[in-house]
A protein has these predicted regions:
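Glycine-rich beta-alpha junction loops
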Residues: 152-159, 210, 235-240, 305, ...
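A short, conserved beta-to-alpha structural element at the edge of catalytic cores
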Residues: 226-246
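Acidic, Ser/Thr-rich peripheral helices and adjacent loops at domain boundaries
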Residues: 245-287
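Extended hydrophobic secondary-structure segments that form protein cores and membrane-embedded regions
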Residues: 12-15, 47-55, 151-154, 231-236, ...
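Patatin-like phospholipase
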Residues: 6-12, 20-122, 128, 134, ...
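Small-residue-rich anion-binding loops in enzyme active sites
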Residues: 1-14, 154-160
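Active-site gating loop/helix substructures
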Residues: 113, 117, 131-136, 141-226, ...
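C-terminal helical/tail subdomains of lipid-metabolizing enzymes
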Residues: 275-374
Length: 374
């Protein structure tokens, strides 16, 4: 049997970068928002407390938080991905459809044309089109005023420091008035894309340093024991795969390991933190009330919110076992998948993401007593 449902539910979402693989996240987010509608019943408060993202995950996150409500978020995501989809003739073979993005994605990026200056290039594409796309599909007034914490990351090219652009103040960090450039900066992956300048500082894609901004989402949760805290992490990358057979596959596998392994390391770190929190709670239970300085006592109580790490739920969008359970054919992304914005690929990924997330999250919500068990 699952646990008894609590009356207050906090949900956080972490979105990875991965180029066109972000269509998996698109489908998964739609499923999550629909299930949130299903559990949001009278007498229960369901809150989306945080959405953090990197690169294409930052763009998806902006559509969710930069919306008036869950219905509006779904509409904005669908409109965004319609614009990012490349329509190709039906008689084209898959490889040609995939590689068409090398010539640009009109709502995202276009090739540089100053070929006479090629020896001074530091990037291959112009990302100005994405600024217009973000302005069209994200309500930045709603995003900046939202109660949902929004955090995206980017790397200061010169200093190497990881910058966080957030719509809420946090500790000593002031809030940022989020605009299209902050979101674009999080997705400015070299050498394809140029650095994005903000206030005289040039930024590259935050995924270079950390492709899964887990901690920023965790810190948005409350420390109350009366709240059911659920953190959903969208994982785009396979842990295991057959040996690469050519240089393109080598590069793709390198990206999978580079961008996917950090999440697994964070989970191991999370287990250690949980043990420390458990120790703090046990100490707090035997220390006489009022014997600690108020500030220290408050910090010990606040430590409880980090136990949310026990409730991290990976929606592994590349898990063959989960795909089999969902009744989906086992498939493997071919080389160059990160740039495949063709209509067939986007629809397939959306549909897979939706089905896998719906299956995984439906079970999760049943276990938390939020939905009736089947």
């Amino acid at each position: 049997m699952g646990q008894a449902a609590k009356n207050e539910i906090e949900i956080g979402v972490v979105l990875q970068g991965g180029g066109a693989l972000g269509a998996y996240e698109f489908g998964a987010i739609i499923a999550l928002l629909e299930l949130m509608d299903a559990i949001d019943v009278p007498g229960r408060k369901v809150s989306l407390v945080a959405v953090t993202g990197v690169s294409i995950g930052a763009i998806n996150a902006a559509c969710v938080v930069g919306a008036k409500d869950r219905t509006d978020a779904r509409r904005r995501l669908r409109a965004l991905w319609t614009e990012l989809t490349l329509e190709t003739p039906s008689y084209w073979w898959a490889g040609a459809s995939r590689d068409l993005a090398l010539l640009g994605v009109p709502g995202f990026y276009t090739p540089r044309r100053d070929v006479w200056n090629v020896f001074n290039w530091t990037n291959y594409y112009d990302t100005e089109p994405m600024l217009g796309t973000l302005k069209k599909h994200v309500d930045f007034d709603s995003l900046n005023a939202s109660k949902t914490a929004f955090v995206v990351t980017a790397v200061d090219v010169a200093s190497g420091e990881l910058a966080r652009f957030r719509n809420h103040p946090h500790k000593k960090e002031a809030k940022t008035e989020i605009g299209p450039r902050h979101v674009l900066a999080s997705g400015s992956l070299p050498p394809g894309f140029p650095a994005t300048p903000i206030n005289g500082i040039n930024f590259w894609d935050g995924g270079i340093v950390d492709n899964t901004p887990l901690g920023d989402a965790i810190e948005a949760f409350s420390g109350s024991g009366d709240v059911d805290r659920i953190l959903v992490v969208m994982n785009l990358f396979r842990k295991s795969r057959a040996l690469p057979k050519n240089m393109i596959e080598v590069n793709d596998r390198l990206d999978e390991l580079r961008y996917g392994n950090r999440l697994r390391q964070d989970r191991e770190h999370a287990h250690t933190i949980n043990e420390l929190v458990q120790t703090i709670e046990e100490l707090a239970a035997v220390i006489p009330a009022g014997s600690l300085e108020p500030e220290l006592e408050a910090r010990m109580v606040d430590a409880g919110r980090f136990k949310v790490l026990d409730a991290i739920t990976d929606v592994d969008l590349a898990d063959p076992d989960l795909m089999a359970e969902a009744g989906l054919p086992l498939s493997s992304e071919e080389s160059g998948a990160f740039r495949d914005f063709s209509a067939d690929a986007i629809k397939r990924r959306h549909d897979i993401g939706y089905k896998l997330a719906h299956l995984k999250l439906n079970k999760l919500f049943e276990a938390h007593g939020l939905l009736p068990a089947h």
